[in-house]
């Protein structure tokens, strides 16, 4: 085809700031400088995943970093569309490794896609939506083996009145914390989250009441320390080998019946915890890993109707 192309070295413009996050201003300034040097060129090739940190050392964007690189570059040049090419026809409405006859989701909002990526959809890096959403750039997920397939389009628009997809996040630890009677409720909540903050352990899900807090975490590295600290003023129960199953879609309060379908589908499965997302786009449930396959299959049968 004889198309003129230029290789842009990613290490010259992809950089992390002092906080360990991509430095968007640096990326835009230095990338655009290279692009201006090749105004007549229409095809640019670069590397994904790698970058430099604030000290100038070679670093990386961690797992799935190539998708993140594409999104950061798209945001830097204010692209009309960001395309992520994989080996599957878009993001499916359930896990095709477990559930037969899954189908691609044709349209997702940025928030819906972020939730699915965070809670286990392997096709998409959880962070790659953020740069695109910030600059309102659509993201399209396409299949290299079937380039004519429509794939999945991710935009700021959300379809109303639909459940879109189900995803699952493995290796979850569930912690139930019951306050001692001597501790006022407001101090209890403050102390609990203070422990997780000091141990630098993110909380995936949380539900609270006056004397009970339940949390789900995916980083058990400092679990022993967390339990010891919480045990000073609370009764602590830990269950390992759990999974978060997340249902994503238009779950606004006025869409009566969606929650009933979700709970009805899981009526024979013990659910430890239910948490509603702050954006009304997802409901997350914690259960045993051994119940994961049965839960995904049941949800596939009952919620996509």
Question: Can you name each region flagged by the protein language model?
Answer:
Residues 1-124, 129, 287-288:
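Nucleotide/pyrophosphate-binding catalytic subdomain
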Residues 4-6, 82, 139, 203, ...:
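Hydrophobic anchor at the start of a short beta-strand
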Residues 150-305:
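A conserved regulatory-domain signal marking ACT and ACT-like small-molecule sensing domains
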